[in-house]
């Protein structure tokens, strides 16, 4: 939001929220009906171009987030936080706006029913009009927007983002977009009035605008130096991402739209433009201090990745109705990942004190870890990731979710045994996860019910509870026939349930009203009881000093990390030299020691949930 919002700041459909796409429903139905009855394909092309523009922008979002996390040719190292993601979630409003304008023009303006598919003279005229009047008018309009009156009421909203993402380019107040539409629409309006407009010229011009906007705000340099050496005038006809990045950091330079020649003509070119361009091109891939290795969970988790939909990744993973309609696309994306991704890759970069923290994704779903045919492939990918990180000098790698399964690799011990000379420390985070669960149990608890798969974390929890004279009641399938009558009665009276994978619906129904379910597993139980309390999986709130946090870790809330991930970070912060993986006694670092180190470094436990009144 601008510092002093002016008239027409909000979009007309802002109150609709995510339902704003319903505005396009009549257009879609009408285009299908028109094609079915009178073979009018032009309305269908409007829908196709709209979809293409959304997909095109999403490709840029994913590419930019991957490249900036990797670090190669990154321009600015500053962080992006949740407030920027929330502010820029309206990036698609301008596509809806443009679509409605084109559709209404098609329906109500005479002469639009016979637009040819291609006209060479029209394409050339559009290019000339853009290079001349459009770039010139935009330059002075942009400078006017930086006058205090307009800047404080409108343009400051756009400049709230110092570090830009591709979608930053189109995040403006509604009034600004009206001005941009009038300016950028000049070539199309002129060619229409001259009778030289064509379907291709419209689609190409819109794609060109989107491409240049996204490229200019992607925060990594991608235009090679040899192009400017081969074609020196190109420097004045095509800006670079670093050129426009200076406009967001210096504010009073580099005003041009896509062609810097007007900045050179009127003396507003930033003197650092060339040097920033060269230094950005020379930046190499960043070496992290710690890596957290995770994987995909459900099919919809593709969209919740940081490289996926920014508006979804900034919120906890949950099922959404409209994602059901996108199942076919998710299946296609999952097929692409399985077919072309043979190694892990970076999806997120964070900073905490002097540490650079990366999250890497192993492109497999949770279901793949249940398949014996996939285990060898998964182990090879994890092993390759560890060896590659060790070669680069990474200090710690923590194994998240099912990457540390007991049956898969013995909580990571298999890799240490195969490669005893590893310099990188392998951490499963079990010590901290156990301590998080133990400190979530309300003070004064005398007994708890244990139900779930027996894991390393479960063993550590039960051992500690027994040491503290807390009674642990066990409910397992193999014990059911012998203890059914006794346990059924007792379970209804126990208000603290420690639960892991394998908790059934029937067993949840046995719990008494007000029961607190405390998961010790990587995955949360299904929330079936509204009269019970469900705590999150072992996790901690990260310190405010942690930077570049703009996405959520699976089902966890904002600025919350799983205990297994935090365990790896603490391991790196403390500089511990031992591995924390495997099942023997030496594989668990003294849990209280890890807990105290986490608190000392600013990590905080989550509050217990409460029932809604």
Swiss-Prot record:
Domain Fatty acid hydroxylase: 134-268
Membrane topology, from the record: Multi-pass membrane protein
Keyword Methyltransferase attributed: no
Summary of the tissues where the protein is detected: Not detected in any tissues.
GO CC, alphabetical: membrane
Cellular compartments annotated: Membrane
Keyword tags: Membrane, Transmembrane, Transmembrane helix
Transmembrane segments: 13-33, 44-64, 95-115, 122-142, 182-202, 322-342
Stated family: Belongs to the sterol desaturase family.
PANTHER family referenced in this protein's UniProt entry, alphabetically: STEROL DESATURASE (PTHR11863)
Protein name according to UniProt: Protein CER1-like 2
Species whose genome carries this gene: Arabidopsis thaliana (Mouse-ear cress)
């Amino acid at each position: 939001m601008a510092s002093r919002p002016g008239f027409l700041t909000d979009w007309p459909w802002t109150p609709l929220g995510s339902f704003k796409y319903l505005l396009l429903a009549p257009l879609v139905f009408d285009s299908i009906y028109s094609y079915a009855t009178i073979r009018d394909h032009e309305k269908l092309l409007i829908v196709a171009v709209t979809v293409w523009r959304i997909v095109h922008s999403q490709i840029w979002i994913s590419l930019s987030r991957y490249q900036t996390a990797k670090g190669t040719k990154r321009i600015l190292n500053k962080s992006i936080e949740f407030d920027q993601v929330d502010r820029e979630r309206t990036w698609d409003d301008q596509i809806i706006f443009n679509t409605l304008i084109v559709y209404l023009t098609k329906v109500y303006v005479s002469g639009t029913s016979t637009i040819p598919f291609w006209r060479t003279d029209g394409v050339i005229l559009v290019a000339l009009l853009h290079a001349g009047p459009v770039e010139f008018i935009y330059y002075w309009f942009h400078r006017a927007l930086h006058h205090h009156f307009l800047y404080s009421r409108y343009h400051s909203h756009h400049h709230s983002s110092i570090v830009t993402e591709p979608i930053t380019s189109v995040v403006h107040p509604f009034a600004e977009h009206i001005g941009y539409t009038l300016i950028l629409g000049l070539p199309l309006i002129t060619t229409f009035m001259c009778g030289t407009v064509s379907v291709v010229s419209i689609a190409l011009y819109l794609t060109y605008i989107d491409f240049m906007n996204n490229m200019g705000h992607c925060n990594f340099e991608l235009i090679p130096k040899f192009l400017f050496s081969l074609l020196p005038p190109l420097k004045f006809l095509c800006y670079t991402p670093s050129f426009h990045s200076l406009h967001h950091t210096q504010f009073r330079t580099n005003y041009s739209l896509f062609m810097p020649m007007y900045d050179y003509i009127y003396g507003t070119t930033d003197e650092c433009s060339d040097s920033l361009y060269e230094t950005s091109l020379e930046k190499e891939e960043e070496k992290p201090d710690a890596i957290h290795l995770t994987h995909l969970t459900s099919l919809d988790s593709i969209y919740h990745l940081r490289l996926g939909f920014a508006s979804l990744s900034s919120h906890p993973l949950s099922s959404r109705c409209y994602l059901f309609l996108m199942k076919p696309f998710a299946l296609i994306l999952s097929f692409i990942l399985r077919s072309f991704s043979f190694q892990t890759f970076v999806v997120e970069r964070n900073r905490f004190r002097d540490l650079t923290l990366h999250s890497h994704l192993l492109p497999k779903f949770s279901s793949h870890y249940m398949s014996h045919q996939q285990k060898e492939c998964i182990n090879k990918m994890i092993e390759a990731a560890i060896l590659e990180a060790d070669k680069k000098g990474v200090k710690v790698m923590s194994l998240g979710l099912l990457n540390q399964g007991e049956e898969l690799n013995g909580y990571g011990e298999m890799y240490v045994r195969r490669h005893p000379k590893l310099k990188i420390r392998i951490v499963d985070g079990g010590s901290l996860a156990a301590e998080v669960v133990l400190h979530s149990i309300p003070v004064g608890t005398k007994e708890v019910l244990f139900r779930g798969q027996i894991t390393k974390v479960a063993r550590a929890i039960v051992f500690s509870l027994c040491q503290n004279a807390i009674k642990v009641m066990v409910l397992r399938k193999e014990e059911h026939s012998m203890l059914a009558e006794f346990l059924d009665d007792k379970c209804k009276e126990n208000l603290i349930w420690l639960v892991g994978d394998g908790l059934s619906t029937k067993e949840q129904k046995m719990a008494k009203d007000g029961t607190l379910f405390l998961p010790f597993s990587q995955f949360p139980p299904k929330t079936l009881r509204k009269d019970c309390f469900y705590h999150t999986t072992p996790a901690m709130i990260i310190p405010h000093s942690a930077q570049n946090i703009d996405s959520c870790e699976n089902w966890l809330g904002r600025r919350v990390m799983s205990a297994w991930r935090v365990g790896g970070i603490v391991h790196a912060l403390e500089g511990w030299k031992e591995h924390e993986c495997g099942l023997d006694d030496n594989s668990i670092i003294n849990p209280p020691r890890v807990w105290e180190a986490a608190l000392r470094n600013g990590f905080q436990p989550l509050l217990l949930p409460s029932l809604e009144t």
